[in-house]
Curated annotation (Swiss-Prot):
Transmembrane segments: none
Classification of source organism: Bacteria, Pseudomonadati, Pseudomonadota, Gammaproteobacteria, Enterobacterales
Subcellular localization: Cytoplasm
Species assigned in the record: Escherichia fergusonii (strain ATCC 35469 / DSM 13698 / CCUG 18766 / IAM 14443 / JCM 21226 / LMG 7866 / NBRC 102419 / NCTC 12128 / CDC 0568-73)
Main location: cytoplasm
Gene3D superfamilies (alphabetical): 4'-phosphopantetheinyl transferase domain
Protein name: Holo-[acyl-carrier-protein] synthase
Taxonomy, superkingdom: Bacteria
EC number: 2.7.8.7
Length: 126
C-alpha cells in the first residue's frame, strides 16, 4: 500500500456554534449525510458532533487533494464509528467515484476534541 494523501483540519467549536445560532440547521443539513443528520438531531452535544464531522470532512477533502468542489460535497463523506468506537469514513456519490478512480483501498481517520477545538487527520491509501 502507498499513501495517496494526508489531510488535517482544526475547527473552533464556538465558530460552529455561532453559525448554528445565526442560520439554524442549514450548516448541519449541508455538512451531514442522512445518517449523520439523524444522529445530530438527538445528540446530547450537537454542536460538538457537527464540529468534529466538519473537521473530518475537511481533512478528507484535503487528503484527496480536491477540496470541496467539482461535484464533491461535505455530505458525500460520512463519519461513523466501528464496533470498537474507532472513527471511520464512508463515501457516497462523487467522493466514492473519485476514490475508485484514484484506487483508494483504505482510509484512516483520527479525531480529537477539547473544550474549544476539534481536529481530525485523514490518510488515504492505494
Amino acid at each position: 500500500m502507498a499513501i495517496l494523501g494526508l489531510g488535517t483540519d482544526i475547527v473552533e467549536i464556538a465558530r460552529i456554534e455561532s453559525v448554528i445560532a445565526r442560520s439554524g440547521e442549514r450548516l448541519a443539513r449541508r455538512v451531514l449525510s442522512d445518517n449523520e443528520w439523524e444522529i445530530w438531531k438527538t445528540h446530547h452535544q450537537p454542536v460538538r458532533f457537527l464540529a468534529k464531522r466538519f473537521a473530518v470532512k475537511e481533512a478528507a477533502a484535503k487528503a484527496f487533494g480536491t477540496g470541496i468542489r467539482n461535484g464533491l460535497a461535505f455530505n458525500q463523506f460520512e463519519v461513523f464509528n466501528d464496533e470498537l468506537g474507532k472513527p471511520r469514513l464512508r463515501l457516497w456519490g462523487e467522493a466514492l467515484k473519485l476514490a475508485e478512480k484514484l484506487g483508494v483501498v483504505n482510509m484512516h481517520v483520527t479525531l480529537a476534541d477539547e473544550r474549544h477545538y476539534a481536529c481530525a487527520t485523514v490518510i488515504i491509501e492505494s
